[in-house]
Amino acid sequence: MTVLEETQEFGGISRTVKHNGNRMDIGGHRFFSKDDRIMDWWKTVLPLQGAPSYDDKKLGRDHDMEPGGPDPETEDKVMLKRHRVSRIFWNRHFFDYPISLSPNTLKAMGFKLTMVAGFSYLKSMFHKLPEDNLENFYINRFGRKLYSMFFEGYTEKLWGRHPSQISADWGAQRVKGLSIMGVLKNAFQKLLPKKRSNAEVETSLIEEFWYPKYGPGQLWETVESNCEAAGVKVLTDARVVEVRQTDGAVSSVVYEDSEGNRTELSGDQFISSMPVKDLVNAIDAAGADPEAVDSKPAPADMTEVANGLPYRDFVTVGLLVKHLKLKNTTSIPTLGNPPIVPDCWIYVQDPGYKVGRLQIFNNWSPYLVKDVDDTVWIGLEYFCEEGDSFWNMTDEEATKFAIQELTRMQVINGPQDVLDSHRERVKKAYPAYFDTYDRMPELVDYLDSFGNLYCVGRNGQHRYNNMDHSMATAIEAVKDIKSGETSKDNVWSVNTDKSYHEEK
């Protein structure tokens, strides 16, 4: 078995970047799944903590510890249990994420706006719109007023398109069962003494998650080490440039190393997580060679669909600051001097800012930050297009822009508080649901015609899956290979089951 990784690091957008003793989680990854196979596998790779972490001990926080589990203060291979706190920043106010009918929300909105939003939601309950786009999907679940406040501008910021131009499929996969009724149902069930299973909790409403001591990249670094110990050949800086076929099956791939050298690798079964666009264009890419008589490049209509699949690219700027101007006005204890806000994420849904989300790495894991008591390590997430003006900024320009936004938001006092910075750019971070996306079924049929080729993962299926769904596609692919199952419907159907979309 051979694994080819295009870059020098494993994990893709789930990797962890190390910078001057601090660590950045590129996309922010909660380890939580309704699929017990995934949860069990995670804790096999990194066992759950059996003793309190640094901040748990210092703040007196309680978690259910794993009997016999490792102590994160003395051992590195450990999965932490973390409390989830996320909020929305809109109109200079903080709201619960997801939106709830809490006293804080009602106070921040005011009586008049609350009444308008309430009647708007009631109208949406009795007058359902056809869910032929993402805008209608949101309005049906939250009403037009809340949609216009919290979803319309943020979605356009994320995708660069108005929600009316985006397929409702994205909402079905990412928002799933979330709605005002779902929020109320969850609030009521929390009052009951019975402990609920993961499958009974809407993913967007979870209150606790797991997280590797040193970020998600630690998990994939551990997996790489385990694979090599088991005899798997792992190659980095190995970009697949051609997929060769014979008689309707993939026979080999050609990969290129960092020095431009090309090597052909033959095999019996092939699992691809490379972007669909790149995969289709790589199929017999040397077919234009007149001597390559057996080659059969992808049909023109399939390359048309593949090349039309859109992506949203991503830039994250890390800022190490002395302290926050933003005060912790919650009842949740935190580290810091003064104590920092408790959020893992802050969703910036205010259209006056380009930043989409803030991460406060101190709250994900205290071990991500070199000096967790006296500095705050923040990540600003920006959505853009490769080659646009924001993408092409220098590190200095992007850092200056990020500092200005945090200062305007009154999160920090200004550039005088910034101690260090780092920028990361990620291509094809988010598969998008417009342009030729509606023709994906044609592409799936074509790719499935290669009996020994399995497409898995977010970009491998051009589906905005969570990490656990991406892993489940690989598990299903391996199951098919081992059993001899020829249909790949189970691989493509991960995260399309109605249990993820509908209220139970």
Regions found by a protein language model. Give the residues of each.
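General small-molecule cofactor/ligand-binding pocket signal
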Residues: T2, K233-L235, L419-H422, Y454
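A short coil-to-beta-strand element that immediately follows conserved catalytic motifs
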Residues: F314, N413-R425, K488-D489
